């Protein structure tokens, strides 16, 4: 899944996740394409050991990475599939806001060897 660029940096293939559960926090009306998010693993979650919180600067937790076939949208990875692909913390960006979820792209996995290099700011 990873490739090495001419400069020797690792480039990760595009990985999408679905942000879900926003109605339990602030809703998703304020989210739009390009909004930056942070992902944080929550290994002590009593319901899901692969839970990944989604946070925003200034608001804190706004939801979770979807981990059910009923909440994962399109080509997104579930929290279970993406859990080992990110460090304890990662960064993402909103791509689409759709009914029942928000599709986001992981732009930095939080792992040194998996730094995502974006050639274009708005290539999505």
Predicted regions and their residues:
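Conserved active-site motif detector
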Residues: 1-124
